[in-house]
Regions:
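GHKL (Bergerat-fold) ATPase N-terminal catalytic module, capturing the glycine-rich phosphate-binding loop
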Residues: 1-78, 82-83
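GHKL/Histidine-kinase-like ATPase module
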Residues: 56-64, 75-239, 245-288
Length: 288
């Protein structure tokens, strides 16, 4: 019996119970030599035959078998090297990335060959140009036909993956994430609506390592050009990264305000000249 999925709630990729039937139909239409070893007792061969109305239908030629194991195997014969290379690229199980950062929401694929490639539970879905990394999402849904996931789902998963990686405290990973934000990679749009605390703190730490404690981020060279005389260095960066860093670091306006309110020196009342004392008394009277 087939035609119903038993994979729900398991670690298997399938869900709707139609994948095998559709695959057999494609194989039959292409005239490919496919043998399906269905457990220990049966062998299936898909083909197309016409029914009484002359309509081509998918049929299965089922023959008895006697195998020691009860495995379910699909054997596709006569695949050329070019087709095999293409098929391998669709599955991370067959072609794993060289460097993988795994989290509970998915994997960040830090491998030039996988840059921009989007996988869902190990199966290739699409390519996103200008991404800094590739991704294998665990909790994104693609639907029965494996459509491209929604941008919201992708962006949410990216923020969660980056946040988990940032919280691990690995210096090399922090540097890679900071590089991605500083390079205006396309996945940075994920942080327009959500900037996780763990990632923010890690990026602030990377910023201070590179530019020092007296530096602040700005979105243009003119934004903080008047702060140099205060001993403050301004660093032009992409707006999204500036927005994230300013959750902790001050803006130019805040630096100016703090400087204006800063006490430069303290003087005892007896140290004032007669003129300074007169000015102070005048100021107090105005406040009464």
């Amino acid at each position: 019996y087939f035609g119903e999925s038993t994979k729900r709630g398991s670690d298997c990729i399938g869900q709707y119970g139609e994948g095998l039937k559709l695959a057999m139909l494609v194989f039959a239409r292409l005239g490919m030599d496919v043998v399906i070893k269905n457990g220990a007792n049966e062998t299936w061969k898909p083909s197309l035959e016409k029914d009484k109305l002359g309509v081509e239908c998918l049929t299965l030629d089922i023959t008895p078998a006697s195998r020691k194991d009860g495995h379910f195997d699909v054997v596709i014969n006569d695949i050329n090297e070019e087709a095999w290379d293409l098929i391998r690229s669709w599955f991370l199980r067959l072609t794993p990335a060289a460097v993988v950062q795994k989290t509970s929401y998915g994997e960040l694929l830090d491998d030039p060959e996988f840059t921009g490639k989007i996988f869902v539970r190990g199966v290739y879905v699409c390519t996103r140009p200008k991404y800094e990394f590739g991704y294998n999402f665990f909790r994104v849904e693609t639907g029965r036909d494996r459509q491209i996931p929604s941008s919201f789902d992708i962006n949410f998963s990216i923020t969660m993956i980056w946040d988990e990686l940032a919280k691990r405290g690995d210096a090399a990973t922090h540097k890679q994430l900071y590089k991605g934000l500083a390079s205006e990679a396309a996945e940075n749009e994920a942080f327009d609506l959500r900037q996780p605390d763990g990632l923010t703190f890690a990026m602030v730490s990377e910023f201070k390592k590179e530019y020092g404690e007296n530096a602040i981020p700005v979105s243009s060279t003119s934004e903080g050009s008047d702060l140099e005389h205060l001993g403050v260095a301004t660093v032009p960066l992409p707006q999204r990264l500036v927005s994230m860093l300013r959750r902790t670091l001050p803006s130019p306006e805040r630096v100016r305000q703090d400087h204006a309110e800063k006490i430069v020196a303290r003087h005892a009342l007896g140290e004032l000249t007669k003129e300074e004392r007169a000015n102070l008394d005048y100021a107090f009277r105005k406040l009464e």
